[in-house]
């Protein structure tokens, strides 16, 4: 089996196409370690996100039912949101989102995982917390 090449790509050119509060899009011309070139590679810059898996004392999970324009329909979701500049930590953002979206707060909190939702094109991390009680 061939070993993957983990060397970074060389950026030949980079330009911003959109710069909004919730996301930024840039198009880059890149050269791969083997010499191949990709003339238009799109990178989406987002602030970090938080997810909250919230479970009440009576062992019920809290889900939000809301319309999502990207899907064109309503969707059941766990509590989630953007880490705002005023949030000192991802945990602060998670606590704020849980309260804003459900009215619940307090309880015990544990960082469950940190991952990148789409590391091929997104620059941010998603912090997922388990909130119980």
List each language-model region with its residue ranges.
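Conserved beta-strand segments that form the floor/walls of ligand-binding pockets within enzyme
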Residues: 62-63, 77, 97-99, 110-111, ...
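Conserved Nudix-box catalytic region and its N-terminal flanking loop in Nudix hydrolases
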Residues: 6-8, 41-47, 51-96
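A short coil-to-beta-strand element that immediately follows conserved catalytic motifs
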Residues: 10, 105-112
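Active-site-adjacent beta-strand/loop module that shapes the phosphate/pyrophosphate-binding cleft
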Residues: 26-34, 118-133
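Extended interaction-bearing regions that mediate binding to partners or small molecules
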Residues: 1-16
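Short, solvent-exposed loop/turn elements at beta->coil junctions and helix N-caps
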Residues: 14-16, 113-118
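Hydrophobic pocket-lining residues within nucleotide cofactor-binding pockets
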Residues: 83, 115, 133
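Acidic, metal-coordinating catalytic segment for phosphate/diphosphate chemistry
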Residues: 12-51, 57
């Amino acid at each position: 089996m061939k070993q993957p090449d983990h060397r970074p790509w060389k950026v030949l050119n980079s330009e911003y196409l959109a710069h909004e509060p919730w996301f930024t899009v840039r198009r880059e011309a890149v050269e791969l370690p083997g010499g191949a070139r990709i003339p238009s590679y799109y990178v989406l810059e987002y602030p970090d996100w938080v997810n909250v898996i919230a479970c009440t004392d009576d062992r019920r999970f809290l889900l939000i039912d809301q319309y999502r324009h990207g899907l064109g329909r309503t969707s059941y979701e766990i509590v989630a949101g953007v880490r705002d500049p005023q949030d000192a930590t991802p945990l602060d953002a998670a606590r704020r989102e849980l309260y804003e979206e459900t009215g619940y707060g307090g309880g015990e909190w544990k960082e469950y995982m940190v991952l990148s939702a789409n590391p091929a094109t997104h620059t941010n991390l998603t912090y997922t917390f388990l909130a119980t009680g």
